[in-house]
């Protein structure tokens, strides 16, 4: 019998963890009606670096991408810089309902995924399948 012990050092790269996602519907941002997505997430190893939170939108199956008028996936993002090595962010993403690009009279369920990225576009955390009902009347 041979025993082999393998040790691996912890990753020294940046990490993130999404701690809460809250949806607030029918809010006005100026003269634009939409929804706020309130996020709380922690990052580590990101001091002085840019952190980006993005909401990617889908139909109810959470796999069929919701596309804008240009054929790109509907999304909304916000970036900030981490002031500390370990930082907790509270961030609000505003998604104008018009930006969902749904035909007038459409009603049904949609979903969005939240992803946290570093400044190089590396995905640090993701939470999928946040659903909501939308009616475009």
Regions found by a protein language model. Give the residues of each.
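Solvent-exposed residues in well-ordered beta-strands and their adjoining turns
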Residues: 40-44, 58, 96
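Short beta-strand elements
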Residues: 1-10, 73-78, 119-137
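Short aromatic-acidic-glycine turn motif
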Residues: 58-70
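Short, solvent-exposed, Trp/other aromatic-anchored flexible loops in extracytoplasmic proteins
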Residues: 72-120
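A short beta-turn/strand-edge loop motif at beta-sheet boundaries
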Residues: 43-51, 63-66, 104
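Short, compositionally biased P/S/T/A/G/V-rich stretches that sit at domain boundaries
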Residues: 3-37, 133-137
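Beta-strand signatures of extracellular beta-sandwich domains
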Residues: 52-58, 115
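Contiguous beta-strand segments within globular domains
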Residues: 27-41, 48-52, 90-92
């Amino acid at each position: 019998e041979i025993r082999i012990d393998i040790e691996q050092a912890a990753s020294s790269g940046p990490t993130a963890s999404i701690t809460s996602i809250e949806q607030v519907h029918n809010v006005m941002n100026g003269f634009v009606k939409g929804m706020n997505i309130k996020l709380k997430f922690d990052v580590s190893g990101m001091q002085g670096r840019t952190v980006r939170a993005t909401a990617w939108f889908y139909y109810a199956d959470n796999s069929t991408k919701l596309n804008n008028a240009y054929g790109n996936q509907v999304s909304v993002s916000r970036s900030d810089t981490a002031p500390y090595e370990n930082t907790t962010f509270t961030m609000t993403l505003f998604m104008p309902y018009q930006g969902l690009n749904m035909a007038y009279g459409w009603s049904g369920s949609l979903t969005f995924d939240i992803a946290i990225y570093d400044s190089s576009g590396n995905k640090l955390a993701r939470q999928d399948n946040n659903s909501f009902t939308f009616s475009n009347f």
